[in-house]
Curated annotation (Swiss-Prot):
Its cofactor is Mg(2+). It is an enzyme of class 2 (transferase). It catalyses: UMP + diphosphate = 5-phospho-alpha-D-ribose 1-diphosphate + uracil. The gene is upp. This is Uracil phosphoribosyltransferase. Pfam families: UPRTase. Pathway: Pyrimidine metabolism; UMP biosynthesis via salvage pathway; UMP from uracil: step 1/1.
Length: 210
């Protein structure tokens, strides 16, 4: 359906997506579920990591085994909703470095503005995973990827729980080489820019704000 877009349809992920869509799911359970889904998605997102063979001594004999080789990983949550996804992924890849990008839309120009950015100093040497629960218009995600490229990033993946077709098209128009990993592609956006059926405002539901 879309090039360079991967829908992760594992039964556990799809079950948990159903739970976070439910308006009756409270903030505590919502946070836990988002972290769990992100951790499960990380398994697929990192499937193409290169391996190298090493030898280790077991209590019985020397074994030839494999470890991750090549570039190190970096997780970049888009503030604020991406934070919980980053925490979930860190449970699976605890050695990854974490950077943060904060973006808002200028009300007059409607262009994304970076208000916060703290990144590992060696991002050019890392495979970066940008995380944000929702890919709606694609403006924030595309801007975040642009800002990372400006700072030397060479390898970037985007991971979202739920995406709208409009967001996917916008990101791939600006960054066609960036793969997008999602748990669901929904119908589209409503007049307020929310994904339909979506799950509402992920940030508000994660942190109990309105």
């Amino acid at each position: 359906m879309y090039e360079n877009v991967f829908v992760i349809d594992h039964p556990l992920i799809q079950h948990k997506i159903s739970l976070i869509r439910d308006e009756n799911t409270g903030s505590k359970e919502f946070r836990e579920l988002v972290g769990e889904i992100a951790m499960l998605m990380a398994y697929e997102v990192t499937r193409d990591l290169p391996l190298e063979e090493i030898e280790v001594k077991t209590p019985i004999a020397v074994a030839k085994t494999k470890v991750i080789a090549g570039k190190k990983l970096g997780i970049i949550p888009i503030l604020r909703a991406g934070l919980v996804m980053a925490d979930g992924m860190l449970k699976l890849i605890p050695t990854a470095k974490v950077g943060h990008i904060g973006i808002y839309r200028d009300p007059e120009t409607l262009k994304p503005v970076e208000y916060y950015c703290k990144l590992p100093s060696d991002i050019a040497e890392r495979d970066l995973i940008v995380v944000d629960p929702m890919l709606a218009t694609g403006g924030s995600a595309s801007a975040a990827i642009h800002f990372l490229k400006e700072r030397g990033a060479q390898s970037i993946k985007l991971v979202n729980l739920i995406a709208a077709p409009e967001g996917i098209k916008a990101v791939h128009k600006d960054h066609p080489e960036v793969p997008i990993y999602v748990a669901s592609i929904d119908q589209g956006l409503n007049e307020h820019g929310y994904i339909v059926p979506g799950l509402g405002d992920a940030g508000d539901r994660l942190f109990g704000t309105k």
